[in-house]
């Protein structure tokens, strides 16, 4: 026996499938051995046969009325490998066919020329699924990772073995063992069957019609091809990485959704007109870790407090953060105009978590509304589990009612697994917790509001109790003297009404001139001619003081100033305007101090004439926006500080 015939026995002597590969050398193997074009296959164990291409129904596919012959060869790139890893496809060369026709025409029909094959395909077996299509007709089915399927029928030569197809059946079960043998004891795989189990999983992954994974297999094909051309020195690539090729999906390592509702409490107490209500809201968090991504949301805390007859609402929290890993995207939206903040993130379509947190705060009309919301939702399609959690805090404040509401709700659903009972019902759970309080505000007691300085100026009069509050530091002796004089002068006030008008007209004609010279006259004194003239003026001022005290008493008795006689309206308005401008000096500048003046003559003089008219008007203009928020106590006190001089 020649060395060529001993070659397969030599290379397959220690091979695991030596029963299949202990055959004579075929045409393709002989051509590769002699040609030396592919050194990697020169001493490689091979098992080859000739096939013709057919359709799924078993019909012969002919191209240009010719049968398509295909030589299928299963080989191993290295004798170290436990299983073959490469499939070679070859066809008769065109040049060889033309040469055979010419030789047959020259030498006759009995001449049988040597057959030359052309190597067309080199496919790693991990991307090819070989199965038995029809045992009786000796047909095989080849399904590639690209999704294409070919049907081949064995066409042995005349000198081939009769049980050649049985060897192909053994080889198919060697490359792809039955599913029962893999599932029988999957926890303890042997060294020989571990690769077979992996090959089975690979073949199951690349099912019929899986055309979406074409672009993913190119890298693995190049890697396997380079490993094959390396002479078998490199080991077989990791099958764990192969299992992921052909599937365009990511599996999450775990998804856990936890919901918590803590601190839903409401307290309401009434002490007088005071009520307090508190509610602290709920938090939900969900986390998912793995290749799909992760999302976290925590927050949504709201609090509301109400004290006394007035209510104040506060809402804090509603912060959301979303984090994504593994190519996922996160989005956050802020709308400051509407007072709404939202944040959320999506994850993978297989199993993921979606979380959102939002808060709103607005004041429609006289009321206030503050709400806080957070929620999470997770779903695992593989385990058929889903969970939802939501927490809400709301506070509504109006003029009469304060409403505080806080609550949390969680929903979980779990469908029965495929291994369990097929008629089982899904397990669902719902937890709801709410707490709220309502505080009703009673009508506030009517509080007297003090008039504004600007209002008093427009109305044309000055309230006595305001002036009494500003100049309330007068001595008790002065008050007693004023009361005695008021009682004594009240009787003669009516008789001297005509004299009062005359003195008032005289005093109004002098205007600022008499006001400026009065202070100078009271301090230093001038000639007797001026003193005689002003003596009458002092008498008129004394009568003016009596009439003003009478008018103040009438106003204290709630009599309207507009109901006075129209005949004396002109004189009274002028005199009231002067006294009003004088009193405003005490309201705006309460720190004014009255100085005691001395003179040789006796009588009553107005000491506050030291304040000029320009200063009074400027001070009043600056005090137009002044508002008295406190309650004014009504006291009957004189606004004019008088000083009695010895005669």
UniProtKB/Swiss-Prot annotation:
GO terms for biological process: acrosome assembly; cell morphogenesis; gene expression; single fertilization; vacuole organization. Residues 492-501 have a biased composition (Basic residues). Pfam families: GARIL_Rab2_bd. It is found in: Golgi apparatus; Nucleus, Cajal body. A motif (Bipartite nuclear localization signal) lies at residues 494-511. The modification Phosphoserine is found at residues 378, 634, 636. Residues 188-220, 267-296, 361-384, 465-573 are annotated as: Disordered. Keywords: Golgi apparatus, Nucleus, Phosphoprotein. The keyword Phosphoprotein applies. Residues 205-214, 478-491, 528-556 have a biased composition (Basic and acidic residues). May be involved in RNA biogenesis. This is Golgi-associated RAB2B interactor protein 3.
């Amino acid at each position: 026996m020649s060395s060529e015939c001993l070659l397969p026995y030599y290379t397959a002597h220690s091979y695991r499938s030596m029963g299949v590969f202990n055959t004579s050398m075929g045409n393709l193997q002989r051509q590769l051995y002699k040609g030396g074009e592919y050194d990697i296959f020169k001493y490689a164990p091979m098992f080859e046969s000739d096939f013709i291409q057919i359709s799924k129904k078993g019909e012969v596919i002919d191209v240009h009325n010719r049968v398509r012959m295909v030589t299928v060869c299963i080989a191993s790139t290295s004798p170290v490998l436990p299983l073959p890893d490469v499939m070679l496809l070859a066809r008769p060369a065109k040049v060889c066919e033309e040469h055979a026709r010419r030789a047959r025409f020259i030498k006759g029909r009995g001449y049988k020329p040597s057959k030359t094959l052309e190597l067309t395909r080199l496919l790693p077996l991990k991307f090819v699924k070989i199965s038995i299509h029809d045992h009786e007709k000796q047909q095989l089915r080849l399904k590639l990772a690209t999704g294409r399927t070919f049907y081949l029928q064995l066409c042995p030569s005349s000198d081939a073995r009769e049980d050649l197809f049985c060897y192909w059946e053994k080889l198919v079960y060697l490359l792809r063992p039955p599913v029962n043998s893999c599932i029988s004891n999957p926890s303890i795989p042997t060294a020989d069957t571990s690769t077979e189990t992996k090959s089975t999983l690979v073949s199951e992954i690349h099912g019929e019609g899986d055309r979406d994974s074409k672009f993913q297999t190119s890298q693995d094909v190049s890697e396997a091809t380079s490993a094959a051309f390396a002479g078998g020195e490199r080991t077989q690539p990791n099958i764990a990485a192969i299992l992921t090729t052909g599937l365009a999906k990511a599996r999450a390592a775990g998804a856990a959704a936890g919901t918590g509702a803590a601190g839903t409490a409401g307290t309401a107490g009434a002490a007088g007109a005071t009520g307090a209500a508190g509610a602290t809201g709920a938090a939900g968090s969900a986390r998912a870790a793995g290749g799909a991504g992760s999302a976290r949301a925590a927050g949504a805390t709201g609090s509301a407090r109400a004290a006394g007859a007035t209510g104040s609402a506060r809402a804090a929290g509603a912060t959301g953060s979303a984090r994504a890993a593994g190519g996922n995207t996160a989005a956050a939206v802020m709308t400051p105009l509407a007072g709404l903040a939202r944040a959320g993130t999506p994850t993978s379509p297989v199993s993921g978590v979606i979380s959102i947190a939002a808060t709103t705060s607005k004041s429609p009309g006289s009321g206030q509304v503050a709400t806080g919301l957070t929620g999470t939702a997770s779903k695992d399609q593989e385990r058929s589990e889903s969970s939802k959690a939501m927490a809400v805090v709301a506070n509504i404040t109006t003029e009469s009612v304060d409403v505080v509401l806080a609550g949390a709700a969680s929903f979980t659903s779990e469908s029965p697994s495929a291994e369990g009972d097929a008629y089982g019902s899904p397990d669902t759970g719902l937890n709801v917790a709410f707490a709220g309080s309502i505080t009703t505000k009673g009508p506030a007691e009517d509080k007297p509001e003090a008039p504004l300085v600007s209002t008093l100026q427009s109305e044309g009069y000055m309230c006595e109790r305001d002036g009494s509050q500003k100049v309330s530091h007068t001595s008790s002796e002065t008050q007693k003297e004023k009361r005695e004089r008021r009682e004594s002068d009240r009787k003669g006030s009516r008789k001297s009404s005509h004299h009062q008008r005359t003195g008032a007209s005289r005093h109004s004609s002098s205007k600022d001139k008499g006001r400026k010279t009065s202070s100078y006259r009271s301090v230093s004194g001038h000639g007797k001619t001026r003193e005689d003239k002003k003596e009458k003026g002092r008498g008129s001022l004394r009568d003016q003081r009596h009439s003003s005290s009478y008018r103040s008493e009438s106003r204290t008795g709630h009599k309207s100033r507009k109901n006075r006689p129209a005949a004396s309206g002109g004189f009274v308005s002028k005199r009231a305007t002067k006294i009003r401008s004088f009193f405003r000096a005490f309201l705006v500048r309460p720190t004014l101090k009255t100085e005691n003046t001395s003179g040789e003559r006796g009588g009553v003089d107005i000491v506050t004439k030291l304040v000029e008219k320009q200063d009074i008007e400027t001070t009043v203009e600056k005090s137009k926006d002044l508002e008295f928020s406190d309650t004014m106590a009504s006291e009957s006190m004189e606004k004019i500080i008088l000083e009695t001089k010895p005669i």
